[in-house]
Amino acid sequence: MELLTTVASFFTPTTLFLLLNLMIGTIVVTSRLGSGSRKHYQHHDGFGSGHAPAPLARAPSIIDRVKSINFHLYKFPHPETELFSMTAHHDIIGSDLHVYPDPNPAPLQRAPSLLDRVKSINMSYFKFPHDVTGSDPHSHSHSHLDLHPDPAPAPLQRAPSLLDRVKSINMSYFKFQQYNPEENDYAHHTEPTRFESIPTRMGRVDPIDISKFRIPEEDQPTGTGVNSQINPPGLTRAPSILERVKSIKLSSFYRSDPDLDQKQNPDPVLHEEHKHVRSKSESKKPVKKKKKALTKMTKSASEKSGFGFAGSHAEAPETVESLERRRPDTTRVERSTSFGDGEDGVDAKASDFINKFKQQLKLQRLDSILRYKEMLKAH
């Protein structure tokens, strides 16, 4: 610790200032002694000239350096004497290269313009070969190729226009082959393909069994049958939704004539559906309403059976059950729906309307299939 305190006491500002002055003084003394010994050696040395050295030259400025550039070195090459004239004016002293300008320099040549450069292009390499016989120019490309240009080249030919190039296309490659039916039939019989068993569109439509769809007499097309040949004048536009809704006959829900009902419902499946609706609606009806409806029905049946004769009153009235057996199912349903009151009658009407609408959709679907088949036959 005592050593550190003694060393730290020496690093005071006064001691540091004295140390700095001592270093500066030693540098000055050594520099003076060195310069005096150098002068002594220059005067008494045998290799020295004995004269005072020349003062140092000022470094040239940037302008002097730019002015000293000799542009004669960048002129276009002259005859063989240029290299000799350049080497003749070079004076080598030690390791320095001094270039002196030529006292009689040649005049500078003007650089060639763009037009002169374009004119200097030898177009003889790009001329088209003379092909008078119509032979392929590519086959004689090696014979016409010459590394040395012709001393007296022929005048340049005009480049072919777009029309000439189009006319030069050989269309024989694109001609269709002549059709020979005998050869094609023979090739067809000798080399059958594996696509013969695939049915066409017409073959796919023919197997459709149209007998499943029953068409009413008013919607059936005119002709001997469904499969008869029909030549329609043109394709008709498919009916819109509004036309389909308008085509639904709502008057059939309030008819009581059995003949009209038999024409509109020839399908036995629909009869079964109507029986089911009738049984369901009758099960929900009260007994009094049913009796009232049956009495009205017996009265109408007796009026129809009498036909205004006097002997009809003498006969015993038929029972309601016998009348119901003789009447078709559609008539029963419509009478029950027409004479029904309340919610039961509304349900029966709604179910009948839904059945009619489904039948119309089936008929329209069958009609579209028939039109598509006729279109395929026409094509």
From Swiss-Prot:
Induction: Rapidly induced in local tissues by both compatible and incompatible P.syringae pv. tomato DC3000 strains. Accumulates transiently in systemic tissue after challenge with incompatible P.syringae pv. tomato DC3000(avrRpm1) strain but not with a compatible strains; this systemic induction is abolished by a treatment with the calcium ion channel blocker LaCl(3), thus being dependent of a cytoplasmic calcium burst. Triggered by jasmonic acid (JA) and wounding.
The entry's keywords: Glycoprotein, Membrane, Transmembrane, Transmembrane helix
Membrane topology, as annotated: Single-pass membrane protein
Pfam families from the UniProt entry: DUF4408, DUF761
Residue ranges crossing the lipid bilayer per the database entry: 7-29
Residues carrying a glycan: 122, 170
Bias (Polar residues) ranges: 221-231
Region (Disordered): 133-154, 216-238, 256-347
InterPro entries named in the record: DUF4408, DUF761_pln
Basic and acidic residues compositional bias, start-end: 137-149, 256-285, 322-335
Localization annotation: Membrane
GO annotation terms (biological process): defense response to bacterium; response to bacterium; response to jasmonic acid; response to wounding
GO cellular component: membrane
Protein name as annotated: Pathogen-associated molecular patterns-induced protein A70
Name of the gene this protein is made from: A70
